[in-house]
Structures are given as C-alpha cells and as structure tokens.
Amino acid sequence: MNVRFGSPLSRGLRLLDRLSEPATAHAHCDIPCGIYDPHLAQIAAHTVVRMNQLINDLGDAPGPGDKQKNDAWHNSMARYVAVKEEHAELVKKEVRIIWGDYFKPEHLEKYPELHTIVWNIMKLGSKARQTVDMQAAQDLLAEVQKFAEIFWATKGASTQRQPSRQTSGGEIVYPA
C-alpha cells in the first residue's frame, strides 16, 4: 500500500468526490430525512392552553395554616407553570425548524402572511411563557393552526379542522 496516495479504495472514493457534485441536504435533522409536520407544535399549543386552564382552576393559594394543602397547591402550581413554559418553547422550536428548513422563497411568495404568522407565534410563545394569560394561549394556538394550514397547502394537501379530543378542547388541523 502506498502511504502517500492511500489504498485503491480511498483513491477511488476521492476521485468520485471530485467527479460528482454533492447535493444539498434539506431537512430538520440535516440527514436529510425530509420529515416535517406541524402536529407537535399544535399539541404543544394545546398543552399551553390546558396548563392555563389548570392554573386558573387551581384558584388562590390556601393560607399558611394548612401546610399540607399549601404544599400541594404550590407543587401543582410549579408543575403547571413548568409544563406551560416547556410547551410554549416547544411550539417556538418546532415552528422555527419548519420555518427555517422547510419553507422556501416560493412558499413565501404564495403566502406572504407567513412572515407575520411566524412572528406572532414567536411573540405569543414568549408571552405564554411569561404570563398566565388564557387569551395569549388561545391566540398562540390559533396562529399555530394557521401555520399548519399553510404548511399543508404547500404540500398540496387541503386541510380540515377536527375536534382535538384533548382536555384543552378546541381543534387540530389535519391534512385531508
């Protein structure tokens, strides 16, 4: 084996690399797998709505006189807030992946409102993390649903809204 030039196999592979132009990879995981779906963003937005419902249903903290009830209330509140924040950030992450890796200039030409929808999702996702605001949570879900409808339209699929059958209520956008 010639150390300077490598094995015949490695020389052959280098030659192939020089003769063929590499293709560009386009996918959220950069493999490319080509798998994109706004469903997870919708479920995460429903979770943000549900956590707001649970926080509102929790009511006011009990007085310091009953340690067990007070501890249980604070435990529940901490868990609801943590899950609300985690899922609001998950909405933003999933939308950023599709926005950055899937959508192309031709999609934006056809759906110029997409910029505003994504911007709204980012702002509402932050607001949902920072506050207990049912309206912000509902608005986040509505914007994610608009995003999902445009996403499926770019794939040539019509959409339908179906009851979510989740405890948060509302609907989920599915490709028809």
PLM region spans:
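Short, solvent-exposed, charged loop/turn and helix-capping segments
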Residues: 94-111
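N-terminal intrinsically disordered, cationic/polar leader segments
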Residues: 2-77, 113-144, 150-170, 174
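Alpha-helical scaffold segments in carbohydrate-active enzymes
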Residues: 83-90, 94, 123, 143-146, ...
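Alpha-helical segments in soluble extracytoplasmic regions
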Residues: 66, 70-95
